[in-house]
């Protein structure tokens, strides 16, 4: 547990708390029992850990109000409980060369003006149980809950040279926030025949009529397939470059508030 001393700010006014843990095994069985926790602007470095959590609201890599900075190198991080993603971010979290497994919850959740970056990492998600206000199954979830745990702003997910597997629901889901998704040279698989590549729409959070999403999707040397669904209060800007390709339907119901597609001469949409 790393607490930086500030309950209201992310990475500012911290007291400099810095926790490093290496080559360890962490197992939790209770509810609200995450594997590693960072809050209040603290800093955590985790090297080659094996984390298993089985309770509800028990993310393997977890942050809370005030956020901080988390760097994870190698290891395996597994959750089986409801509302327990492999990563829950109200911080700036980077994961390198690791394995992330979520069996009941979303794989990664990013709340508000916070970030998750994965490099050379395998993420496998099954999301078999809905939790709280959730109405859809998904793997990577970017949103603003309005609880006060995270500042309002752009939620950001970046993945490079990684393997992303979705077994139930949408690969990416965005609601009630502005979001940026950066994808470079990943293998992205959705095994759910009804799952979308990306869904952006209103949901249970925020004020009705203004609680959709505004998404910028950047693809670099990236292949992807599936459908993209954008509702009437949401927007998408999609940038493809360096031999990127997307195969699937985009806004097939013609419902989006706006969609902008930008392709360089080496990229294509099929």
Enumerate the language-model features and the residues they cover:
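Surface-exposed loop/turn motifs in large extracellular/passenger domains
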Residues: 1-29, 37-57, 62-82, 87-104, ...
């Amino acid at each position: 547990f790393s607490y930086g001393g500030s309950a209201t700010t992310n990475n500012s006014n911290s007291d400099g708390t810095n926790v490093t843990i290496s080559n360890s095994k962490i197992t939790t069985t209770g509810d609200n029992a995450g594997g590693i926790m960072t809050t209040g602007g603290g800093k955590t470095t985790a090297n080659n850990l094996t984390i298993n959590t089985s309770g509800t609201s028990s993310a393997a890599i977890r942050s809370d109000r005030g956020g901080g900075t988390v760097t994870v190198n190698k290891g395996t991080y597994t959750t089986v409980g409801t509302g327990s993603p492999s990563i829950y971010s109200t911080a700036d979290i980077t994961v390198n060369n690791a394995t992330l497994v979520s069996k009941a919850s979303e794989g990664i959740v990013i709340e508000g003006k916070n970030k998750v970056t994965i490099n050379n990492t395998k993420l496998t998600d099954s999301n078999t149980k809905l939790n709280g206000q959730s109405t859809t199954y998904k793997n990577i979830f970017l949103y603003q809950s309005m609880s006060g745990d995270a500042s309002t702003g752009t939620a950001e997910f970046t993945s490079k040279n990684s393997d992303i597997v979705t077994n139930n629901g949408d690969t990416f889901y965005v609601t009630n926030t502005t979001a940026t998704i950066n994808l470079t040279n990943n293998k992205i698989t959705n095994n759910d025949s009804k799952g979308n590549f990306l869904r952006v729409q209103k949901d249970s959070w925020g004020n009705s009529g203004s609680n959709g999403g505004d998404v910028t999707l950047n693809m670099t040397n990236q292949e992807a397939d599936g459908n993209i669904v954008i509702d009437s209060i949401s927007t998408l800007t999609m940038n493809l470059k360096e031999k990127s390709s997307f195969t699937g339907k985009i806004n097939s119901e013609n419902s989006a508030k706006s969609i902008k597609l930008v392709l360089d001469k080496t990229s294509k949409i099929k």
